[in-house]
UniProtKB/Swiss-Prot annotation:
The Asp-Asp-Xaa-Xaa-Asp/Glu (DDXXD/E) motif is important for the catalytic activity, presumably through binding to Mg(2+). Involved in monoterpene (C10) and sesquiterpene (C15) biosynthesis. Converts geranyl diphosphate (GPP) into S-linalool and farnesyl diphosphate (FPP) into (3S)-E-nerolidol. Probably not expressed in wild strawberry species. GO terms for molecular function: magnesium ion binding; terpene synthase activity. InterPro entries: Isoprenoid_synthase_dom_sf, Terpene_cyclase-like_1_C, Terpene_cyclase_plant_C1, Terpene_synth_N, Terpene_synth_N_sf, Terpene_synthase-like, Terpene_synthase_metal-bd, Terpenoid_cyclase/PrenylTrfase. This is (3S,6E)-nerolidol synthase 1, chloroplastic. Pathway: Secondary metabolite biosynthesis; terpenoid biosynthesis.
């Protein structure tokens, strides 16, 4: 059995014990909890979050479904054999046909199972660097460009100059090549600041693809529409994989084999996630905060989805469980600042977090004492685990992250207590910190335990651009959701509202367009950071990217202020079994 499969086997076994969780149907995922009564100066859509499952919405355990009754050992042996078979097929195909190798890598990544084939992908893409511009096929050039950039190779944008006319614009004849246009559109999502050719490529391909929708057959129109809505760079592979299953047509044997591998993988991973939810629910229930702080959100399943989306390797089970704990406290403290705390009490709470001394809680109200004590204990326990496992005490960095978060929350509380909105730039600068992204990624870095050095920790403490760009994307996406109703209270504090206040005569549509463009700019900055040398391990940078990809699912509200995409993601990852 291959080493990666054996490690997976150890994570997957044993199965979730049915008696450890209540048995309910998957429809219970959609049950709604009651909305909380909020003050009129609500900052971000807290009430809307209550539309997601709470800790009282347990998961029903499911098992891998097969056509014949087989032991788990048999399933793993067969899975390992198919993995090894596909590795050989991938190596051989890439040697014989460079484009076929790229197609196979693309399929593996779209199915979200590339962690099984990292060595093979590394070797193939390294060889592909020598032929980046030795082709006149738009599909192949764009695919190679995208896969190489995704893998950290900086391929220049001028590889697309061959597809421009004498005026320097993309040739109109390319409009007949739908497959090539989709590949070009996908490649354009890897652009960085100042890359005008890729900006033009996105506009050119996007316009022609939208135009083509009216005359394509239903199947092809679905594929094109999905490309426009969910380009691979900005989408979670785990969420889009099922769509790839439906739309990809097996024209060769390797795709059928790969789908078989992916189906088994999906079911195994789902069982791992269910096991983790049991652990998180147990921790959250024993913590008891939901009983003591009745105003706060009770949604450990939602909080866990951040960990599940960010750390996709099944072997990182312990890390996902531990990461959910600080994420839970980000939401909890956010509720204290947004929903319940008076300004005077919030000042005292922030001072206590900055001092990080248990005696600092003496003058706090009881509910704040409970929260601070729980945060203090969780952080110290977290630090001990990291030190025991990786030999580095992260407590100083963790304290800095929590203090920065509370300081940013307090700045916002003072703004809204005064009834005055800040300038949009000032709001966003503070909002990047109050997003909580830095807290989550700092904890994640130490959990992973890779390349922890004085240099990397110092950079982490200063909030590197990789983190701030992801945080800006979250803040702006969140604010787009809270600004959907132009008749809402003007003190909600979204970037859109700050921008409207600052620019007299600007319409809400113009302000939203400005926000959308800023999100695009932050993606370009994030792309640049992921291509630039940095001291962070690949697992961490990949998780940072996945966090940015997760954001639209977390903040895309519908007309009922519900989150249909997030609910669908939870259902796919935690409930639905892929038929074997």
């Amino acid at each position: 059995m291959a080493s990666s499969s054996w490690a997976f086997f150890k994570v997957f076994n044993p199965q979730i014990a049915p008696k450890s969780i209540s048995h309910i149907g998957q429809s219970d995922l959609m049950q709604l909890t009651h909305k909380k009564q909020l003050p009129t100066f609500q900052r971000r859509g807290i009430a809307e979050d209550s539309l997601l499952p709470s800790s009282t919405t347990p998961i029903k355990p499911m098992h891998v479904e097969t056509k014949h009754t087989r032991t788990m050992g048999d399933i793993f042996v067969q899975h390992s054999q198919k993995l090894e078979l596909f590795r050989n097929v991938l190596r051989n195909a890439a040697e014989l046909d460079a484009l076929e190798g790229l197609n196979m890598i693309d399929a593996v990544q779209r199915l979200g199972i590339d962690y099984h084939f990292q060595r093979e992908i590394d070797e193939i893409l390294h060889k592909q660097m020598g032929i980046v511009s030795a082709c006149d096929d738009l599909y192949e050039v764009a695919l190679r460009f995208r896969l190489l950039r995704q893998h950290g190779y900086f391929v220049p944008e001028d590889v697309f100059n061959n597809f421009k006319d004498s005026k320097g614009t993309f040739k109109q004849v390319l409009g007949e090549d739908i497959k090539g246009l989709m590949s070009l559109y996908e490649a354009s999502q890897l652009g960085t600041e100042g890359e005008d050719t890729l900006v033009e490529a996105e506009k050119f391909s996007g316009h022609l693809l939208k135009t083509s929708l009216s005359h394509l057959d239903r199947h092809r129109a679905r594929i094109v529409g999905n490309t426009l809505r969910n380009p691979h760079r900005k989408s979670l592979a785990s969420f889009m994989a099922r769509n790839f299953f439906v739309t990809s047509q097996a024209t060769n044997s390797w795709l059928n084999l790969l789908k078989e591998v992916a189906k088994t993988d999906f079911n195994m991973v789902r069982s791992v996630h269910q096991k983790e939810i049991v652990q998180i629910s147990k921790w959250w229930k024993e913590l008891g905060l939901v009983k003591e702080l009745k105003f706060a959100r009770d949604q450990p399943l939602k909080w866990y989805t951040w960990s599940m989306a960010g750390l996709t390797d099944p072997k990182l089970s312990e890390e996902r469980v531990e990461l959910t704990k600080p994420i839970s406290f980000v939401y909890l403290i956010d509720d204290i600042f947004d929903v319940y705390g008076t300004l005077d009490d919030l000042i005292l709470f922030t001072e206590a977090v900055n001092r990080w001394e248990i005696t600092a809680i003496d003058h706090l109200p009881d509910y704040m004492k409970i929260c601070f004590k729980a945060l203090y204990d969780m952080t110290n326990e977290f630090s001990c685990k990291v030190y025991q496992k990786h030999g580095w005490n992260p407590l100083r960095s963790l304290k800095i992250s929590w203090a920065s978060l509370c300081n940013a929350f307090l700045v916002e509380a003072k703004w809204f207590a005064s009834g005055q909105l800040p300038k949009s730039e000032e709001y966003l600068k503070n909002g990047i910190v109050s997003s909580g992204v830095n807290v989550g990624l700092v904890h994640m870095f130490f959990l992973l335990g890779q390349n922890i050095t004085r240099k990397s920790v110092e950079l982490l403490n200063e909030t590197p651009a990789m983190i701030s760009s992801s945080a800006a994307i979250l803040r702006l996406w969140d604010d787009l959701g809270s600004a959907k109703d132009e008749n809402q209270d003007g003190n909600d504090g979204s970037y859109v509202r700050c921008y409207l206040e600052e620019h007299e005569g600007c319409s809400i549509e113009e302000a939203r367009e400005k926000t959308i463009n800023m999100i695009s700019d932050e993606w370009k900055k994030l792309n640049r950071e992921l291509l630039s040398p940095n001291p962070f391990p690949a697992t961490f940078t990949s998780a940072s990217l996945n966090l940015a990809r997760m954001i639209p699912l977390m903040y895309s509200y519908d007309g009922n202020q519900s989150l249909p995409s997030l609910k669908e993601y939870m259902k796919l990852m935690l409930y639905e079994t892929v038929s074997m």
